[in-house]
Amino acid sequence: MAPLTFDVPAEFDGQRLDRFLVSVLAEHSRSQIQKAIADGHVAVETGPRRGGPPAHGERSGGPLGPPVKPNLIVHEGDRVDVELPAPVATEVSGESLPLDILYQDSDVAVVNKPAGMVVHPGAGHGSGTLVNALLHHLTDLSGVGGELRPGIVHRLDRGTSGLMVVAKHDAAHHELARQFHDREVEKEYIGLVWGVVRAGRRIDAAIGRDRANRQKMSARAKHAREAVTRITRAHQLPGLTLCQVAIQTGRTHQIRVHLSAIGHPIVGDALYGGVHRRVAGDIRAVQRLERPFLHAARLLFTHPRDGRRMEFIARLPDDLQRVLDDLPGWKDRR
């Protein structure tokens, strides 16, 4: 596979090399990236802002050169070349992975996806995905999405936890997809953001692929699609706001992009500027959070067979709850 090249932007200045690559190569796990670094498939060239020689020699025919270390600190203006092996086509099979199934019947299932789990197989993720877990735990799944996405009607980012509805047959899939398309499904998230955000704020900004970094989305892209996000509730904490966020559209990275665009990125979101900030007391839980503080907490849809409106709530997972519990003013908020 041809090498991918990334110029380190300002928001990643001072980051470890492996953490930077985890952020820009969203479809690859940290262990895969660390192996690529160890095998010499990653090169770092010192940027012009700091001067100095490249981190190592010119690219050779296969690996990019002598290995650098995963904990190498990169800086704004550095150039990182990555050569990842082409994905090997594999048959998708069920795997005995833990899966929190909140509800299921003959038509649908509702699951609580953990953070760190990719929804479906793709480049660098032939196993360990939600689809692999679904194939093990459920006997029937729709085939509309193709062999790699059975049952999948909508998605969550790898780093986002929370609720997803899964279709068990094609008729249910088509009806649920229609509801998402016609904006009849209600989706609400809980996110912790930097700064003070007021309830009632509406963010109406089209989203498209970022021209400078193809792994990112942008609210300033040339070819963009409508996207609307609303802050429905907000609880202020020192330097932070815990928000309840509703989305009317379902664009890739929508909440993360929109909140970053208004200057209030999600805590822990390295890709969109949510790291390297400090709060009162230098809260360690915030500093060590390695994924965006974003959780799909509420899902409301119409049952595809009998027309019932079905509402599901998923409480914050333990890693996010621990962050809240360590924040000044949270435990004594009442």
Where are the predicted features?
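A short beta-turn/loop motif at secondary-structure boundaries
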Residues: R155-R158, H223, H235-L237
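Short histidine-centered loop motifs in beta-beta connectors
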Residues: P67-V68, C243-A246
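Short beta-strand micro-motifs in enzyme catalytic cores
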Residues: A109, T241-C243, A297
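Oxyanion-binding "anion nests"
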Residues: E226-I231
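Pseudouridine synthases involved in rRNA/tRNA modification
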Residues: M1-K35, A212, K216, K222-R225, ...
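Short beta-strand segments enriched for Tyr within beta-sheet-rich domains
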Residues: L176, R251-L259
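A generic structural motif
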Residues: E45, A234, A246, T302-P304
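RNA pseudouridine synthases
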Residues: M1-R211, F293, I313-W330
